[in-house]
Amino acid sequence: MLPMEHPLPLSFVLPNPATLPGLALGFIDGNFVDLQDLLLRASTLTSNLNHDCSDLNDRLLHLRTDLTKHAVSWISTSLSAKVSLEDLRLNLESLLCLPTDSVGKQTNWELQQVVEELCRIQNRRKYFVTALKLESLVGDLEDSVFHPISKRKGSTLQDLALKQERFSHAIKTMNEIEEILGDVTRHHSRWRRLVDSVDSRVDKSLSVLRPQIIADHRAFLSSLGWPPKLATSKVEHGEVDSIPNPLLLMQGDKKESYSQSFLLLCGLQQHNTQKEKRKKLNMTKETDNDGLWATDELVKPVASRMEYHFLKWAEQPEFIFELVYKVTRDFADGVDDFLQPLIDRAMLVSCSAKEAWVSAMVQMLSGFLEKKVFPGLIDMYKEKHMKSEGISSWFHLVDQMVTFDKRMQSFVNTDTCLSYEGSSTAFSQGISVMGLFCKKPEWLKTWGKIELKDAYRKSKEDIKNEKAWVIDSERTRLGNESNSQSAKYVLSTREDYKAPLVADSFLNRTWRLIDHGLSLPAILPRIQFIRATATRFLWCIFKILLLEFKKTDLSHYGLSEDTLIQACGPVNAARYLESKLREWSDDLVFVEMWAAETSVKVDRKPEVSCQGCFFGEELKSLVELETNWLMEIITVFLHQFDNLCSDHFHNNAVSWDEDVITSSSNLTVSQGVAEALDNLRRHLCVLHLNMNPKDFLDLWRNLAEGLDHYVSRKFFSGEPVLRRQKFDRFEVDAEALLTVLKPYCVRPGAFFPRVREILRLLRMHEEEKARLRGALSRSGNTCLKLFGISNLSPQLVEQFCRSY
């Protein structure tokens, strides 16, 4: 064992008294009685001296700052005044030397120079004043931030309160600095270097201040017993008791300390918000979905405890969503009651404690799904042997997400009044787990592909059903008989449009895709999803309708009633789809999306968004399909009519004498014309029973126009025959033609204007014909309206007058 070393004598440690100044010796003699007293009180004296030196240094720094500020202000003012007075003296002296005629121009020029110089001086003065004020505030901030951190951390609530007071002063100083910088940014854009310099110094202080405030806040939460247990073991009547909230158990100094810590976090967030707004003055504004930082600090420890359960339930997402909903609901009222007054004290505008809590919980869940769940589903979807299982899991998860968002929306809306459902502002992205797809466009695209393929597959199964395209003729007949004439055209349901059953299936699947798109909280991803799914699915439906119509054998050689009924199926379905698309497009949700799409043209050509509504291009294509199909049916009718009575309606037809069916006193309709009109009447009856009223109205009106052209052209195509019986025959056949449309309108002659005017010409007396010839020779074409003729061309009227 080594012998103990003796400490050195004091003579080797203390300085030689002979070398010390007199003031130092006097100070030591005044504070220490003897050597033993020196050993006992030396450390205390050293601490006091260091403290006094620190205070003196602080005072010296403030004195230097004040002295610099006053000196610069005085020097700047005096120099500016001296220079201005000297310039004014020189200008007045030079003004006396100028001739009288040039005094005015010189005076104006010099006054302009004086104004510019004064503005420059004023601008410099503002710069110096602003710089000195910022220097003073930044120095004060640095003192508040760095001075308390250099000391020993307090372990009591009093030490924490002192530290919070210093931090609060620092945040207040930062807000004052930010207010000045905001004014400089708006009105003095050339002072960029000053702003950057101040930002750099403030950021250094903030990099120390923010972690310290957050660390103290987390430590205080941990001391309160946060987070609590996620469930209790006490069960009564089959229900688990609600989870106790430690925030509501705080009293006295603890409650006040937490309140101050909460306000510090809110102050930091407010400062950060103002700073971001200042930096984005000249940039494109983006929607910030940051929640309340203080609420996020409550959720983070809860999330770490919940993740254990989440990992166990990765393949049973309904349990995950149920747990999050339960915890959110159990703590929401307590959080709202305790934190909302603090938010009001922090003067956070439009901030709800309940919504901030719900948003933080939802964002926590979204983060877990983003990191742990969806990557696995994407991998399963890419693997061929697991693709079907991946799609099934994907659908199940998305359904759970949509249901969860609706439950959360309903929960938040219990005591708040939000805008209409589906609006882009009704359910913020922060309170929607579906917002995950807004952040991940590639996942949104994958989801759209899965939904579209599934909808198309199910639609192909629907059209294979034997009754898919069946029209209930008996039901529509009874409906036609019971409805009034005006009510026939007030259509709303599938039965009103006489559409087949498959039309409802098409619409239901389309709306399901749209409804999934509307569950997205952001409007642009919503548009992208609906365009990628519902819109493309509509084009698939149009193709199915087109193929179904092409299956009908529309031929004028063997046109049957069954063929016409089969053709009515896709026509009615198209009209029903058109009505629903127009109804959806008038909804405010689609009006908003169309306006947003028109402004940014999301994945659409410019001309596509100019149709007047969200489904404008689809409606345009659907109307073209309906028009083409109706024209095809009309063309078949006209061809069949021409085949049956092609030798009639000529004014020189030789077969009229043989085809006349006589009665006791009057002429009757020709056999060929009667057969053609009977065919036409039967076909119209079939269409009237099986086609929707709107398309049937368009069909018979256009058919009447075609027959009107056909008959009038036939009348003027041959050589004139001056036999009264021929005229009577044409009149009888034409009148029979008009009666075919009698069941569908009151005045069928209004839809055959050319035939009606031919009959008028044939019924003219010789004197009236002579007047018409004379008027044509004198006035030309302008006189026809005086004789009630406006649809026949002047050339045809002249031909008639020359021939008869």
Curated annotation (Swiss-Prot):
Keywords: Endoplasmic reticulum, ER-Golgi transport, Membrane, Protein transport, Transport. The keyword Calcium does not apply. GO terms for cellular component: COPI-coated Golgi to ER transport vesicle; COPII-coated ER to Golgi transport vesicle; Dsl1/NZR complex; endoplasmic reticulum; endoplasmic reticulum membrane. It is found in: Endoplasmic reticulum membrane. Its main location: endoplasmic reticulum. The keyword Transmembrane helix does not apply. It is a peripheral membrane protein. Induction: By salt and osmotic stresses. GO terms for biological process: endoplasmic reticulum to Golgi vesicle-mediated transport; protein transport; retrograde vesicle-mediated transport, Golgi to endoplasmic reticulum. May function in the anterograde transport of protein from the endoplasmic reticulum (ER) to the Golgi complex and in the retrograde transport from the Golgi complex to the ER. Belongs to the RINT1 family. This is RINT1-like protein MAG2L.
